[in-house]
Amino acid sequence: MSGKEVGVYDIADGQKIDITSTKNELVITYHGRLRSFSEEDTHKIKAWLEDKINSNLLIEMVIPQADISFSDSLRLGYERGIILMKEIKKIYPDVVIDMSVNSAASSTMSKAIITTINKKVSE
């Protein structure tokens, strides 16, 4: 890593994300330093969330620690997670979101995993 890249891990540089989903899970895989979402990506996230509005969401940010320091990997995970939460809150402002960040030396992909947690109805 050159000196000019230090501290610029999450600046959008024309790279993209991949979004895959199942009924219970949405996985956003980040390629490179991209931190923002295109309109098309936002539509994919919205489509997955449509029938989950009555659920709480859990976001797990997984950030590899191979090329950056532990503190930078945590910062990157929290920044991306907050940006993702802002996008979700624009669509569904009342949804409850919990987030965790895992910096894993063994992981090679930077990704966000969104799952649902059914709300408990108070008696």
Language-model features, listed with the residues they occupy:
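Short, surface-exposed beta-strand segments enriched in small/polar/acidic residues
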Residues: 27, 50-76, 99-103
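Cysteine-centered nucleophilic/redox motifs
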Residues: 45, 77-92
